[in-house]
Design a protein with these regions (language model features):
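Signature of alpha-helical transmembrane segments and their immediate interfacial
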Residues: 1-38, 354, 359, 363, ...
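Interfacial segments of transmembrane alpha-helices in multi-pass membrane proteins
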Residues: 11, 205-261, 329-333, 591-637, ...
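Extracytoplasmic
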Residues: 55, 61, 84, 126-233, ...
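Pore- and gate-forming transmembrane helices of large, multi-pass membrane proteins
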Residues: 240, 279, 293-330, 618, ...
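Juxtamembrane segments of multi-pass membrane proteins
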Residues: 390-393, 397-516
Length: 746
């Protein structure tokens, strides 16, 4: 049945190619429906209690991750024209669609005459630099907003913008940020744009940039290698058309089902260009081999080739897909989508390869011999040396592996949220500037909650004895996160005391505090929930690793144990949830490696039904993974989600070469008199195709080193390293193990 289908494809290449073209055109129509976005929520685990707590916090207090910090550095810090520009910008920013509120050096002047900079546009304005310096120093020392809008040395100033909830999507955020840049572009200060909202918007820009940056060099590498190996334009064009068609089909399917491109799935087209081309190369290489070796007509050679290779590359595509499908065992939606989409893309590449490549070759009658055995000198040396000294090729890689594996126990999973950016990146430097002068950009929330029971019938969270505990909590945060900025009822009341001229020791009663809170209005930062049983300390903190934050959580827990039993403390916010998710995701991805290994082992066991062959295959494919893990530990590199994800993915890809080698070895055993001859024949026949496909994979993954994202950079580096190491093992360790391990030779 299958042979008849392939016969129809080969005999009717025009119909086959037109069918592929028609389906490609239809799916292309759905690509414009794809949307590009990045949200912190994409990284949240679906089953994490901390996520539920965060969304509960958002329901009570609103979003805390919709802040933009615009920093300015003036040329002349005290020139009146500078302040005229800043005041105009302040009013313009307040009018922007999507901006809920703006805080600046002009905000405090409406409440406190000592912070009023004067009538900047009046004809009789008396501008005195010393007076301005005094006023700016007064503004900077305000407990509530001073350190957020002016640096301590007055060198930098800032506007703090809070976006409306409806503007919390990529399209509206981009429009707001574009308008902000337009308003500030032709003014005298230099400007820096920072904050989580800017981070999200710029991330999307980096995604688009990376795709445009990756594809040209990858295409050049593919075309160059295919041209060198096959020396035939048809054999160059067909693999390129295969991966291009695969990408279009997958993007069309994503658009059809309403999927979006996010911080992980943006790399899917690039990966399919790298991974999806190997099937076409194996088909073309085997067709050349059959045409050259046997007395087949081109049609017979193609039919034999497609019958042989359709099954082989289906199995190798299945093992590659398993590596990606294993990622779906995590509870992070974007990781699940990434695994599903790449797995589907790999199988699409298989389908396109077994239809488009044979049809194209038959249509254009590309039956020339081309270049044979591109890597024959290396393969000849291996086929001659390995049978003579198999134990050398076993002991050396095992020794290197055990040396590296010894350090695996010291691997760290410590990470921070800004680890995604490379240190030389402009956005990274902008965030660091904000950290240095304005306390950071990462949202951190601490809640002091009052339990509703008989002990608290007559209590409210603004009782003096409860505010004392809130003050202790805020003092601890200021001590442990000394470069960060926090805001609560306590800092608000300190600011009120300063404006009123009250002593710092004065305590306000509940009625007065209620009046202060009511006067702030709904558009201001909410410091107490509607039920009035929770107080909020909101902060923008500097970048911290998960281990550093764990120490802070421990100190907060220790302090909270000294509070009355009816008070509890919770830490939440996107920073808290994202760091906890990072630790969970690393563990989950390590588990996915185990899942991939189990399923791949089952496939190998079913195919070969030989314990020795299965053992040889597992050793060959696990050594690169554990060796790289050990090297990471030696180099002091932490295991993070992108590095953890690499291992199950690379395992799925690396097993392909082992399968090709072992399937050919099994075939050669039936045709040769002993295993030495079978190993030599296998290395010479399969080795060239393996080296071609691995060279393409390693070169393609190496292009990812150009990415602005450190996770993509690490994913590319580790994948290239593991796949390259896997090839070395497949061409040295695997044949050596096949020679020394006992197994039937028929």
């Amino acid at each position: 049945m299958i042979e008849k289908v392939f016969g129809k494809i080969i005999d009717n290449p025009k119909i086959t190619l037109n069918g592929i073209l028609g389906l490609t055109i239809v799916l292309t129509l759905f690509i414009p429906k794809l949307t590009i976005d990045f949200s912190i929520e994409h990284l949240f685990s679906q089953n994490d209690p901390a996520v539920e707590e965060y969304f509960s916090f958002r329901n009570d207090f609103g979003r805390e991750d919709n802040v933009i910090t615009i920093i300015y550095e003036p040329i002349d810090h005290y020139d009146i024209n500078l302040f005229k520009e800043l005041e105009n910008i302040f009013y313009d920013l307040e009018e922007l669609n999507g901006v809920e509120r703006v805080i600046s050096i002009f905000t405090l002047g409406d409440l406190d005459t000592r912070a009023w900079l004067g009538d900047l546009h009046g004809e009789n304005s008396d501008w005195n630099r010393d007076t301005v310096i005094q006023k700016l120093e007064y503004i900077q020392s305000d407990p509530a907003i001073g350190s957020r809008i002016l640096s301590k040395d007055l060198r930098f100033g800032a506007f703090i913008l809070t976006l409306s909830d409806f503007a919390n999507n990529h399209q509206d955020r981009s429009a707001v940020l574009k308008e902000i840049k337009r308003l500030t572009h032709e003014t005298s200060p230099s400007w820096t744009y920072s904050g989580v909202s800017v981070l999200r918007t710029e991330y999307v820009g980096y995604m688009v940039r990376d795709n445009f940056l990756f594809l040209p060099p990858i295409a050049l590498i593919l075309i160059s290698l295919l041209s060198y190996v096959f020396r035939n334009w048809v054999f160059v064009v067909l693999p390129m058309l295969t991966v291009l068609t695969t990408v279009i089909w997958l993007l069309g399917i994503m658009g059809l089902f309403g999927l979006e491109i996010n911080i992980m799935t943006y790399i899917v087209p690039t990966l399919l260009f790298i991974i999806g081309i190997s099937d076409a190369i194996h088909i073309q290489a085997r067709f050349r081999e059959n045409l050259n070796k046997d007395s087949y007509s081109p049609r017979e050679a193609m039919l034999v080739t497609i019958n042989q290779m359709s099954r082989v590359i289906f199995l190798t595509s299945a093992t590659t897909s398993i590596g990606f499908i294993a990622l779906m065992t995590t509870s992070i939606s974007i990781v699940q989508e990434f695994g599903m989409e790449i797995a589907l893309g790999v199988m699409i590449a298989w389908l396109v390869s077994i239809t488009l490549v044979p049809s194209g070759i038959m249509l254009f009658k590309s039956f020339g011999r081309g270049r044979e055995n591109t890597f024959s000198p290396i393969l000849l040396w291996l086929s001659d040396t390995i049978p003579k000294r198999p134990w050398v090729f076993i002991i050396i890689p095992l020794f290197i592996s055990f040396t590296a594996i010894y350090k695996i126990k010291d691997l760290s999973t410590d990470a921070s949220l800004m680890d995604d950016l490379r240190p030389e990146n402009k956005l990274f430097n902008d965030l660091k500037l904000t950290e240095q002068y304005f306390g950071g950009v990462l949202p951190f929330e601490v809640l002091l909650e009052l339990e509703n029971d008989q002990r608290t019938v007559d209590k409210t969270v603004i009782d003096h004895d409860i505010l004392i505990h809130l003050d202790k909590l805020e003092r601890l945060l200021n001590k442990e996160l000394s470069n960060s900025r926090f805001f609560s009822i306590m800092t608000l009341l300190e600011s009120v005391k300063r404006i009123r001229g009250d002593e710092s020791s004065v305590s306000y009663d509940k009625n007065f505090i209620d009046q202060v809170l009511n006067l702030r209005g709904d558009q201001q930062i909410q410091l107490i929930n509607k039920e009035k049983n929770a107080l909020r300390i909101t902060g923008l903190i500097e970048n911290k690793t998960s281990s550093e934050m764990d120490k802070i959580y421990a100190k907060i827990d220790s302090l909270s144990r000294s509070f009355p039993p009816y008070l509890s403390v919770k830490c939440t916010g996107t920073t808290v949830v994202a760091l906890r998710t990072n630790n969970y995701l690393v563990q989950s991805l390590v588990n996915s490696l185990g899942v991939a290994l189990v399923f791949i082992s089952i496939i190998m066991a079913f195919m070969f039904r030989n314990k020795s062959i299965l053992l040889a295959s597992l050793i060959t494919n696990l050594i690169p993974i554990f060796t790289v893990l050990g090297l990471l530990s030696w180099l002091g590199v932490s295991i993070r989600p992108p590095t953890a994800m690499t291992f199950s993915v690379a395992l799925g890809i690396a097993v392909d070469d082992s399968l090709h080698f072992l399937l050919r070895y099994r075939k050669e055993l039936t045709q040769c008199t002993n295993r030495v001859e079978a190993i030599k024949a296998t290395i010479m026949s399969t080795g060239s195709a393996l080296m071609i496909t691995t060279t393409i994979l390693v070169s393609g993954f190496s292009v990812l080193l150009l990415s602005a994202f450190l996770p993509t950079y690490q994913f590319g580096m580790l994948s290239a390293g593991m796949i390259g190491t896997a090839l070395l093992c497949d061409l040295t360790l695997l044949p050596a193990l096949c020679l020394v391990l006992p197994h039937k030779e028929s």
